[in-house]
């Protein structure tokens, strides 16, 4: 193990901005999350909220997607910012983009991610139990990972979160460790399958993803999909009588809002 120094002027500017944020908040409990958010779904949101409750400042290291079907980095940064701005306390979350840095490109080495978090002064690192390369196993019913020794040697707490699912019996997002119902009640947040739906132009149900996130993704991968989008919008949805141009993103958001309506006979 050791320190990682990235010689990149853009990264250096981001680091300076981070330290200013840390100083302004007088943050002592700083937690790191490293993910590709490809795509950003409700289980990620649950992880965010759990982390924010226990930290003065959360650093989100956004890494490149490692598979050919992955979303563009700028697109991911766009919907991540939109989500944080709308649904989380943005002053307590710092996005640290790791764009075009091959060292973290595959999001496969949690040890490197731990060193990165420690080098920035983080006191905790949160990872999911399904993180590739974590090497998780149980010894006397206690979870063990390859990061256990690193955590002790470098004085950074590593928290391994269990898998989050939506339970149709509990009617909420739960961890697989806390839910008493079987897997036949669980909806899983599988990133690859959600991407396949979006790539096919199918809107994932709101239980999987926020409408703002789905709208940004669909409007990006299907630009100008509807030649007469304005007419479709005006013909289907309520308006204030003033003809206003609606973007693809606004159209998808309105469509998703309508999907969530309940129909009463």
Locate each region found by the language model.
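Non-catalytic terminal extensions that flank enzyme cores
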Residues: 1-108, 114-123, 132-265
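Short beta-strand and adjacent tight-turn residues that come in two discontinuous sequence segments
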Residues: 127
């Amino acid at each position: 193990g050791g320190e990682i120094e990235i010689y990149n002027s853009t990264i250096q500017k981001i680091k300076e901005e981070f330290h200013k944020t840390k100083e302004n908040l007088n943050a002592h409990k700083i937690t790191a999350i490293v993910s590709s958010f490809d795509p950003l779904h409700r289980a990620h949101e649950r992880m965010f909220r759990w982390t924010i409750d226990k930290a003065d400042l959360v650093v989100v290291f956004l890494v490149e997607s490692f598979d050919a079907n992955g979303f563009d980095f700028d697109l991911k940064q766009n919907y991540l910012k939109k989500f944080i701005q709308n649904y989380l306390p943005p002053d307590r979350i710092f996005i640290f983009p790791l764009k075009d840095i091959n060292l973290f490109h595959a999001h496969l080495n949690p040890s490197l991610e731990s060193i990165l978090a420690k080098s920035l002064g983080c006191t905790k690192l949160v990872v999911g139990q399904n993180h590739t390369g974590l090497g998780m196993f149980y010894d006397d019913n206690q979870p063990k990972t390859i990061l256990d020794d690193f955590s002790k040697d470098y004085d950074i707490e590593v928290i391994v979160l269990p898998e989050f699912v939506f339970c149709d019996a509990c009617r909420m997002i739960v961890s697989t460790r806390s839910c008493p119902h079987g897997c036949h009640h669980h909806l899983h947040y599988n990133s690859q399958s959600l991407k396949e739906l979006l790539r096919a132009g199918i809107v994932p149900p709101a239980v999987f993803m926020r409408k703002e996130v789905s709208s940004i993704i669909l409007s990006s991968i299907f630009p100008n999909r509807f030649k007469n989008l304005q007419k479709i919008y005006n013909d289907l949805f309520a308006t204030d009588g003033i003809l206003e141009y609606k973007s693809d993103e606004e159209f998808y958001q309105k469509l998703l809002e309508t999907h969530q309506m309940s129909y009463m006979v």
